[in-house]
Amino acid sequence: MKALFSVLCLVLLVSILRAAVTKPDSGIFTGCLRNRTSLENPITDAIFTSRNTTTFLSSYVSYTKNKRYSSLNYQKLVAIVAAKHVSHVQATVVCAKANGIQLRIRSGGHDYEGLSYTSSVPFVILDMYNLRSITVDVSSKKAWVQAGATLGELYTKINEASQTLAFPAGVCPTVGVGGHITGGGFGNLMRKFGITVDHVIDAQLIGVNGKLLDRATMGEDLFWAIRGGGGASFGVILSWKINLVEVPKILTVFKVSKTLEQGGTDVLYKWQLVATKVPEDLFIRAWPQIVKGTKLGERTIGVVFFAQFLGPTDKLMEIMSQSLPELGLRREDCHEMSWFNTTLFWANYPVGTPTRVLLDRPSTPGEFFKSKSDNIKKPIPKEGLEKIWKTMLKFNFVWIEFNPYGGVMDRIPATATAFPHRKGNLFNLQYSTIWLDAKETENKLTMMKELYEVAGPYVSSNPREALFNFRDFDIGINPSGLNVDEAKIYGYKYFLGNLKRLMDVKAKCDPDNFFKNEQSILPARVM
């Protein structure tokens, strides 16, 4: 891994040297930063430029999660500001705007298409990882969490304060809170409690003029927009105030796999009929993936069923025997544990792994990967599943997550927040693949498009919906920030009927469209 890191740094260094003349002088920008910050909170140590190549490269790579974008247009990067104080964020916004430099905001670096750390025009990365404080108030069941904290850090802090409080969010502990929450993050508590944005009650945001805003000063329209509409189109999210939820002391989890030869297709078909109808205390995710077959060198599809129940094993066994007996769940498949320990289970750590791993922050780049998403309105027929399996087996490594809706998700209006995917959906799909060699990239992307096309007849249509947190350039991009047709395509897929209100909010809070990227919200007048 160290060797790979060194090679990547060398590649990036060559890119810098070749294209040094194509980007603005960082000295003007950094001078602006120093002029707009105080000696009490000096910004000098938070600034990284190519004048100090080693720290510049390491700072860039540390939070680069998709290697497809690790060196793309890197030569356009003017500086990285790893803000340590709110004034650093304010100065970065004001100075970037004043100098005509695009701003990219990075909390954890998990944007699927690298939008938090790449651009085709001169840009600055505003890194939020130093702003990671978390304050939990058990008596009010509320917490403040800064955008640079990770989900693993948030879950750990909640557990330190209470063993019966939780927050409904995702399963990857290294994901940054800032982007995850604002995109409408969901996880295994969504059927019982909803998603992240359903529990946000206040926020701090730096607006286009560098002012610090909260819910009262930003207004209800902007507060609505940043809950599910993607904060990077409207400003820089500093922190969230969230409601925590009560969970039992003991939860039950299980993981059971069925290959096609063991009736995996039949079990998954039945899962489609019941996963949204079982009690909302139960969340069952299905995860088809490529596994070894029974014969040497043979491959097949194994459907893994991950589940979490807010209660004891006895009650879970009763529910499963009535709703999905085809799975053949056994008592020995079940593990009782605290909510905090379930976060390890969902992150795919072995039972018994020390919880301190939730605080790890990997400092090396991730894999090459590509993901796509869909919403499903009616069960996929068995023949459709079989077509999907056939296409999956063309890959070396690929999987699809089937995440059920239902429960409280059916009772929250599509317009309550900017996240619109509520009643009417059975489950969503996330297709993903990873690879190690850059030479495979073109082929892998083509294969993912083929898998997406094969699934097409069985998913939502007009539009074919997509989830904003599973960013996908294939559904449309808007490089100039002015392409009306492309902006409508991806905008309607992500936000459905909420798009118009998002555009109206954008026109009010950022009329000149400073906060933009290839898939941002356009101001209404531009549309």
Swiss-Prot record:
Name recorded for this polypeptide: Berberine bridge enzyme-like 5
Glycosylated residue positions: N35, N52, N341
Protein family according to the UniProt entry: Belongs to the oxygen-dependent FAD-linked oxidoreductase family.
Organism: Arabidopsis thaliana (Mouse-ear cress)
Protein purpose: Probable flavin-dependent oxidoreductase.
Subcellular location: Secreted, Cell wall
PROSITE patterns: FAD_PCMH (PS51387)
Cofactor-binding details, from the entry: Binds 1 FAD per subunit in a bicovalent manner.
Disulfide bonds: C32-C95
Pfam family name, one: FAD_binding_4
Cofactor(s) needed: FAD
Domain FAD-binding PCMH-type: 73-247
Source species, domain of life: Eukaryota
